């Protein structure tokens, strides 16, 4: 027999002792002016996105001639902005652009700015200063270890050719320049000989670098309703300069009306930016302070989703991110917009696919994991995983650049969503900083201008350590509870409090979920004790005596114990059931103690049945075994009482519903299969019943045990997917979403616990326990800047 741990998700009235502590601590935090100011800053970020100015795009807009005079700029305010916003070192680009991944981007922005000023015969001093910057950094142009902006090999040499047309010499060395132009022209010639939708989109996207696409029909298919091409000011400016399209002009005028003198690298961008902030807050565990703002954003996103808005549907990363977030928050969304990417070929036909945009693939991978039971998204998950693995290996070989994206990919592959626990994820994200890195490089670099990453990180650190201090106090109370109830005297029983509590604290981490965590942990400890009692510690008489006492449930009479062990176990069971029932009453407004008693009685009877099979040396059918084993797996006393303590009302008809019991059966069956697969060798050697050995015996299967185990892993995976689907379903659901998610959280616990070793034995797991419960997070000052 085996035991497991459970998790849930939620809100609640809290036990009196902790409530006083919480009131004090929360008031202390509320009085912390800096803490409240940080939260207010984040609320403003969510209300309005401010994207950084792009010197590169502003330069191309500045180069647009007036329709009334080719010798004058249409947008002189952009030219003036370039004159006024050169950096001290002679460059143009993002502030604080010293990061290695931005070096070529800065060169590109600087050259574009020089061209804009040269075109209009203005700013000789700035031009010379910019040329000096390019000369000093000329070695970076050919350095293959530095990240290239999208289209750099086409656009940068294209700008050099344009500089020649303007009688401007770029100080890069004739051999370097000639080689770059030769490679560019060869690339364009090769591209023209092979057709693909992705290539066509790419050539349209880098239009300012080609300057020789004469067929508007090849370009117009990428024009959006707002008049832009790809929502890119630079591409749209180049298109208007070449083709004089009214839609392009309308877009450019609207940009300058909104931003006055300098434009961003992409517009509109609000949807992706705001969704990415939500993901950042969730990945750091601080989203619960911004529920109102998050709901408002997602409501708006859902409206855009339903009407197929271009800002969402035409941007692959935004579409995947919106799908994942809307689904996770209970919105009814179809995966149809992602269907084209079920196969890698669908991705290859896009601009993102042609330029091998790893960031977009990562978003597709995460989206596919959020809806794993659909065959199309299973395929998507498969190819995106392989793609990311290959990309990761190539990064290692070439020691490439974007450390934040690399870390995100590593984490996504190492910690799949079905086996990751929130608080462990939060800690990891806080420490590596990837969750708050908001600089991206496409054709040029951009960042969310009004996001202060140090503020967000400090808030996350404060919250993590605050919650952890509560968790440590709860662990101390549980340690005392074990001693007070003499559980340490039961030498046959494994002492697994740390694991039992961790599984709840890592998922039900919010301070207000204290009662649910305590119930969860006590359920885990007691099911472990009872499991060991039925397995090795008790005689048949003792087992039957314990069942009789629970079945009788006489709180007024004097219990008759057959042994001291039975007395210890029944006493703590009785007190814990009554305590949980009393707490549940404050949440539910009704007596649920009888249901908790039944949960325990069902477990004890299932364990007795297994004990009888073992003592009789009888072999049940696989069907009979599994029908009993999902109960004996012992999740019932862990997760089911906790659902009463999460917050939402659970009427008796809901608890008796098929949906509620199916949630329990699916997660328990999955856990039992995972346990039996991992414990097959040990349990076979001990002569214990096991799903794998029973399958081999009854099915008279000629396949190897390895093949059978793989088959059973597939069955466990299908149960996990069925559970996930049931949790996500909103139409006709009778179980509140918060309660359903408790079962999903337990599924994640089980998949994590059984990834390597048999249940409680992993050293890695103990490391996780310590990091979540005992080790405060601290950051070096440089991590906060």
Curated annotation (Swiss-Prot):
Its EC number is 4.2.3.19. Pathway: Plant hormone biosynthesis; gibberellin biosynthesis; Secondary metabolite biosynthesis; terpenoid biosynthesis. Keywords: Chloroplast, Lyase, Magnesium, Metal-binding, Plastid, Transit peptide. Binds 3 Mg(2+) ions per subunit. It is an enzyme of class 4 (lyase). Mg(2+) 2 binds at residues 531, 535. It is found in: Plastid, Chloroplast. Its cofactor is Mg(2+). It comes from the Eukaryota. Its main location: plastid. The keyword Plastid applies. Mg(2+) 1 binds at residues 531, 535. It catalyses: ent-copalyl diphosphate = ent-kaur-16-ene + diphosphate. Disruption phenotype: Gibberellin-deficient dwarf plants. A motif (DDXXD motif) lies at residues 531-535. Expressed ubiquitously in roots, stems, leaves, flowers and siliques. GO terms for molecular function: ent-kaurene synthase activity; magnesium ion binding. One of its GO terms (cellular component) is chloroplast. Pfam families: Terpene_synth (PF01397), Terpene_synth_C (PF03936). Changing residue 638 to T: Changes catalytic activity. Converts ent-copalyl diphosphate to ent-pimara-8(14),15-diene and diphosphate. GO terms for biological process: gibberellic acid mediated signaling pathway; gibberellin biosynthetic process. Residues 1-29 form a transit peptide. The Asp-Asp-Xaa-Xaa-Asp/Glu (DDXXD/E) motif is important for the catalytic activity, presumably through binding to Mg(2+). Belongs to the terpene synthase family. Tpse subfamily. This is Ent-kaur-16-ene synthase, chloroplastic. The gene is GA2.
